[in-house]
Amino acid sequence: MSNVPAELKYSKEHEWLRKEADGTYTVGITEHAQELLGDMVFVDLPEVGATVSAGDDCSVAESVKAASDIYAPVSGEIVAVNDALSDSPELVNSEPYAGGWIFKIKASDESELESLLDATAYEALLEDE
């Protein structure tokens, strides 16, 4: 079973979301998602300053197996991207919940967080797959 940190929120598309001290949210893909994709070769990062809606595809993770869209779990403005992934996309594999984060977003509607899954619900989703 994949590692599913309890403090994070999750989307049904296998993104995770962590609230930061400054009020922004860090987004990445889950350990389960990176296991399905395999070794990352490239991550197409969103543009800082871009405004996205929940469910918009805003990034692409390319692995040796496939390319997969990464969706915004909440609406808002992209305020930072993980530039380290340009040179080291494998961080998504080795540190999916730490150094392999993909972007940070300033949420425009925090009520959208209610539609995300907690760790228990995400684990149940994985068991059903």
Swiss-Prot record:
One cellular component term from this protein's GO annotations in UniProt: cytosol
Domain of life the protein comes from: Bacteria
N6-lipoyllysine PTM sites in chain numbering: K65
UniProt keyword rRNA processing present: no
Cofactors demanded by this protein: (R)-lipoate
Cofactor remark: Binds 1 lipoyl cofactor covalently.
GO biological process, one term: glycine decarboxylation via glycine cleavage system
Domain Lipoyl-binding: 24-106
InterPro entries the UniProt entry points to: 2-oxoA_DH_lipoyl-BS, Biotin_lipoyl, GCV_H, GCV_H/Fam206, GCV_H_sub, Single_hybrid_motif
SUPFAM superfamilies (UniProt xref): Single hybrid motif
Assigned keywords, A-Z: Lipoyl
Coiled-coil annotated residue ranges, if any: none
Presence of the UniProt keyword Ribonucleoprotein in the record: no
Subunit structure: The glycine cleavage system is composed of four proteins: P, T, L and H.
Entry function: The glycine cleavage system catalyzes the degradation of glycine. The H protein shuttles the methylamine group of glycine from the P protein to the T protein.
Family: Belongs to the GcvH family.
Entry protein name: Glycine cleavage system H protein
Originating organism: Salmonella gallinarum (strain 287/91 / NCTC 13346)
Encoding gene, per UniProt annotation: gcvH
